[in-house]
Amino acid sequence: MGQNGALQPIQLVIITGMSGAGKTVAIQSFEDLGFFCIDNLPPTLLPKFLELVKESGNKMNKVALVMDLRSRDFFDHLFAALDELAEQAWVIPQVLFLDAQDSTLVARYKETRRTHPLAPNEPPLEGIRLERKLLEELKGRAQIIYDTTGLKPRELREKIIRQFSSHAQSGFTINVMSFGFKYGIPIDADLVFDVRFLPNPHYIEHMRPKTGLDDDVSSYVLKWGETQKFLEKLIDLLSFMLPYYQREGKSQLVIAIGCTGGQHRSVALAEYIARHFSDDYKTVVSHRDMERRKDIHR
């Protein structure tokens, strides 16, 4: 109940995405957050199920559902249900789409020795390509997209908890992510900025094993005139754009900052940008590839 006894809107998260991208970990994470969870609810049952939830009188005010292509009537009914829910005041629906690079999904299938549900008699990559094509429109309608490439199950769980815990549900979130171009562009990024033109601490021997979180590396990256000019122009651009993204109803904006390996320059700049906007927006900073180069002692 609200402060005046009014029913609070039901928070509905529909978890979908690529097979092998982490939906099982996701639904378990929502259970840990106190959500009422159902795996593989047919879209035809969604309106009736939500009516029952509504009639419960806020006894189930947080609901997470896994929906995927195991339901053969998936698209015929899901899009219609989403359109109808968008017009209702008593429910706040969000689509969380889990994705990963094809090579990562293939590796996960090989590790578990599973076949792809859409192509059980074909190599996993054939099913992955078909599924990606079928889910393209749904991905375009998702409010939140997670790229689980390189994420361990624990890291995906932590990401979900940061996003969906009760104290975090205060609207628009800016997720500033550093990454290395050598490992691929994050597929969940809304905006991508390339900082490989900046001076590289990798070529300074004592900085090579460190990261952009270390003070001396950060100071080195930020001290250059071209860095300061870039940050000035980028922050000016983002300051202009962010209110419009927020107005469009996005719940999060993923800003990806990339350098060669994702260890030095992109890390320092991602931290700087997140700090700059933290007074006006809820911000989260993450470093996708920061530990990779350290692990191989490049």
Curated annotation (Swiss-Prot):
The entry's keywords: ATP-binding, GTP-binding, Nucleotide-binding
Binding site for GTP: D68, L69, R70, S71
Residues engaged in binding ATP: G17, M18, S19, G20, A21, G22, K23, T24
Molecular function (Gene Ontology), one example: ATP binding
Matching InterPro entries: P-loop_NTPase, RapZ-like, RapZ-like_N, RapZ_C
A Pfam family assignment: RapZ-like_N
Transmembrane intervals: none
NCBIfam families found in the cross-reference section: PRK05416.1
UniProt family annotation: Belongs to the RapZ-like family.
Summary of the function given for this chain in its UniProt record: Displays ATPase and GTPase activities.
Name of the protein in question: Nucleotide-binding protein GK3066
Organism: Geobacillus kaustophilus (strain HTA426)
